[in-house]
Design a protein with these regions (language model features):
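Residue-level recognition of beta-strand microenvironments
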Residues: 44, 74-76, 132
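ABC ATPase nucleotide-binding domains
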Residues: 1-58
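Short, Lys/Arg- and Gly-enriched loop/turn segments at beta-strand edges
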Residues: 110-114, 175-181
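ATPase nucleotide-binding modules
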Residues: 55-103, 107-128, 137, 142-161
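Residue-level signal for well-ordered, solvent-exposed loop/turn and beta-edge residues enriched
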Residues: 40, 72, 128, 150, ...
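A short, acidic, flexible beta-alpha connecting loop/helix-capping segment that sits on the rim
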Residues: 157-160, 173-177
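A short, hydrophobic beta-strand micro-motif
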Residues: 35, 100-105, 164-172
Length: 181
């Protein structure tokens, strides 16, 4: 049905307002989406931008699954629970911001490795698999970075099998982490 609605929209080239609670349907059928919270518009954007660059915690949590990671912006770095990253790695998202900041990072934008990745341009942290669930198309993992109270959701292809309790390396790419308002 999603593709038929989109086809009709494109064929007749008309403006339509379509109200739905089905996120997948909204992403397929829309040129722009308005996300509302308690009767107030939180963000209006194209589906790709809304999903990949949400502006607020509400929008990030409403559209798809995400991990919220609390941090503190200092002069030249961003300090997380157990690790720090140079502020310049965040593509200018933090320009002019200091103090507490919350990041959103989608589960599919975190990678898992059985050994420390070599030559990675991202950030690699030691961690441990806390839980896992096989869902056919992918593994759904809960991982804990070492020396941190964080728990991160990570989805990985079915061929990437890690056991609960196994030590792993967690790959984060700062450019895939969105600073929220």
């Amino acid at each position: 049905m999603r593709f038929e609605i989109r086809r009709l929209h494109d064929e007749f080239r008309i403006t339509t307002v379509y109200v739905t609670h089905d996120q997948g349907e909204a992403m397929v059928t829309s040129d722009r989406i308005a996300v509302m919270n308690a009767g107030r518009i939180e963000q209006i954007d194209e589906p790709f931008a809304l999903y990949n660059r949400p502006r607020t915690r509400f929008v990030a949590g409403f559209i798809g699954r995400t991990n919220f990671i609390e941090a503190r912006r200092e002069a030249n770095s961003v300090s997380f629970d157990g690790f720090a990253v140079p502020a310049g790695r965040f593509n200018g998202e933090l320009d002019g911001r200091t103090g507490a900041v919350t990041f959103s990072v989608r589960p599919q934008n975190i990678s898992l490795h059985g050994s420390q990745p070599a030559g990675t341009d991202g950030l690699a942290l030691p961690g441990k698999i806390v839980e896992r669930a096989y869902l056919g198309e992918f593994w759904d993992y809960v991982v804990a970075p070492a020396d941190s109270a964080l728990r991160l959701r990570v989805v990985a292809p079915p061929r990437e099998v890690f056991e609960a309790g196994q030590n792993v390396w967690i790959g984060l790419a700062p450019e895939q982490m969105t600073a929220l308002a």
